[in-house]
Amino acid sequence: MALTKADMSERLFEELGLNKREAKELVEMFFEEVRMALERGEQVKLSGFGNFTLRDKNQRPGRNPKTGEEIPISARRVVTFRPGQKLKARVEAYVGSGE
């Protein structure tokens, strides 16, 4: 099971009393702000949750799994996520509870 943007919108509708259109717009706006910050090369810090950062990966050798031929994997920029201590603790507590 996965949490979707629609699930988040539904939760805002139920918990905060926003209408469904407002809830959907709020979720979309949040993710658009995160996307735009990352596009500008900025780090995104969500207190109590974690950090999204950009990392440059160098070109490296790879292999075509079908042919075994060696091919270069081009340099690229990737988004990484590092969970914060509070999130780590909550996940560990949940996993430790046997649920």
Curated annotation (Swiss-Prot):
It comes from the Bacteria. One of its GO terms (cellular component) is cytosol. One of its GO terms (molecular function) is structural constituent of chromatin. Keywords: DNA recombination, DNA-binding, Transcription, Transcription regulation, Translation regulation. Disulfide bonds: none annotated. GO terms for biological process: DNA recombination; positive regulation of metabolic process; regulation of DNA-templated transcription; regulation of translation. The keyword Glycoprotein does not apply. This protein is one of the two subunits of integration host factor, a specific DNA-binding protein that functions in genetic recombination as well as in transcriptional and translational control. Belongs to the bacterial histone-like protein family. Heterodimer of an alpha and a beta chain. This is Integration host factor subunit alpha. It comes from Thioalkalivibrio sulfidiphilus (strain HL-EbGR7).
